[in-house]
Amino acid sequence: MSKTPTVGFVSLGCPKATVDSERILTQLRMEGYQIVPSYEDADVVVVNTCGFIDSAKAESLDAIGEAIAENGKVIVTGCMGVDENNIRGVHPSVLAVTGPQQYEQVVNAVHEVVPPSIEHDPFVDLVPPQGIKLTPRHYAYLKISEGCNHSCSFCIIPSMRGKLVSRPVGDVLSEAERLVKAGVKEVLVISQDTSAYGVDLKYKLDFWNGQPVKTRMLELCEELGKMGVWVRLHYVYPYPNVDDVIPLMAAGKILPYLDIPFQHASPKVLKAMKRPAFEDKTLARIKKWREICPELTIRSTFIVGFPGETEEDFQYLLDWLTEAQLDRVGCFQYSPVDGAPAEAMNLEPVPDEIKQDRWDRFMAHQQAISAARLQLKVGKELDVLIDEVDEDGAIGRSWADAPEIDGMVYVDSEQPLQPGDKVRVRVTNADEYDLWAEVI
């Protein structure tokens, strides 16, 4: 019997890239390849890269170099794959380079290096209907579209992943159903722009379980909300149509959680970023959302040190944060990106030391807000999904916490717990980012 061909896989970048990796791995497994966790056991290594900012590109190039040094046979795919000349300039020995979403080309490149076994592999029959997943069994990412129709001046995603292409809602719901049947208890909806879902299809009617459903965020959320699992929305653009899903959150159909990357608050900076400059309306909208759904958790990300940002702009942002009282916030110092429109706008660069100072002040400011908001949860009861268990106890997340990016809930329980368990707890303590609780 011939040796089963083996593939090593390195997946970098955001959850969208994770889903791409899962799709490639599933196809390779269906064709009889064995996925191995070490360089030395792999016949070929695939590196799924990130090319969003320069530091991500550097990390991708380092990962490619490590794979070449440890194995020698390397195929590169993902967002940085659109910059093949740069990759080959640094690593001329890579065997093939493909861009994001080019699943077939990646698999074909693997075929060229190590052909699939012509003998039937009985393990192929064990590939689960939901495919190979890189996340724990109890949660999974559900990608509803590719690409983005915006042209934010700091971003090159449209040039890497193209314009918005929405998946038909029936396909998305079928995948979600397979995940739920496989035991997934939390579905994280992701895309480049979740609130624009279906725009490119003109919200076309599709069919799900024999019923017509519009390819639109509201209808998607309504149907996902019937599946009996946590549904969490990520990468939501602050459009007015976001208002439509808040009642679903208030009714407990989907999690009261919105991930909205506001990026800044100063109208001048937002205009330079080519983002919606309606900060006053945004504050009013946040207030309205919380009136409808008091439990709503809002996560966001911001950029400080964008070219042209003044101290006045930055102070405006801090004041806006005080007013907005966001729950979960991340912040990045602006990083120049080759090919991003911001690099050609002739705006005054912000010196690195000022970027660092503003980042430090931003984080301290938001940390105080986060600590105060979490302190309000002490004494309250929450449902917690357990992610991991060690000798010190269990660690989980509430509806207010997305995996890997938000805080955690440290759970004290007299009964043994397992990852994927959902338990009711009472919060006993809080710090700036995390909670401590006991099972009730």
From Swiss-Prot:
Catalyzes the methylthiolation of an aspartic acid residue of ribosomal protein uS12. [4Fe-4S] cluster 1 binds at C14, C50, C79. It is an enzyme of class 2 (transferase). It comes from Stutzerimonas stutzeri (strain A1501). PROSITE patterns: MTTASE_N, MTTASE_RADICAL, RADICAL_SAM, TRAM. It is found in: Cytoplasm. GO terms for molecular function: 4 iron, 4 sulfur cluster binding; aspartic acid methylthiotransferase activity; metal ion binding; protein methylthiotransferase activity. Keywords: 4Fe-4S, Cytoplasm, Iron, Iron-sulfur, Metal-binding, S-adenosyl-L-methionine, Transferase. The lineage of its organism: Bacteria, Pseudomonadati, Pseudomonadota, Gammaproteobacteria, Pseudomonadales. Binds 2 [4Fe-4S] clusters. One cluster is coordinated with 3 cysteines and an exchangeable S-adenosyl-L-methionine. This is Ribosomal protein uS12 methylthiotransferase RimO. Residues 375-440 form the TRAM domain. [4Fe-4S] cluster 2 binds at C148, C152, C155. Residues 134-372 form the Radical SAM core domain. Its cofactor is [4Fe-4S] cluster. InterPro entries: Elp3/MiaA/NifB-like_rSAM (IPR006638), Methylthiotransferase (IPR005839), Methylthiotransferase_CS (IPR020612), Methylthiotransferase_N (IPR013848), Methylthiotransferase_N_sf (IPR038135), NA-bd_OB-fold (IPR012340), Ribosomal_uS12_MeSTrfase_RimO (IPR005840), rSAM (IPR007197). The keyword Iron-sulfur applies. The keyword Iron-sulfur applies. NCBIfam families: 30S ribosomal protein S12 methylthiotransferase RimO (TIGR01125), MiaB/RimO family radical SAM methylthiotransferase (TIGR00089). Its EC number is 2.8.4.4. GO terms for biological process: tRNA modification. Pfam families: Radical_SAM, TRAM_2, UPF0004. Belongs to the methylthiotransferase family. RimO subfamily. It catalyses: L-aspartate(89)-[ribosomal protein uS12]-hydrogen + (sulfur carrier)-SH + AH2 + 2 S-adenosyl-L-methionine = 3-methylsulfanyl-L-aspartate(89)-[ribosomal protein uS12]-hydrogen + (sulfur carrier)-H + 5'-deoxyadenosine + L-methionine + A + S-adenosyl-L-homocysteine + 2 H(+). Residues 5-115 form the MTTase N-terminal domain.
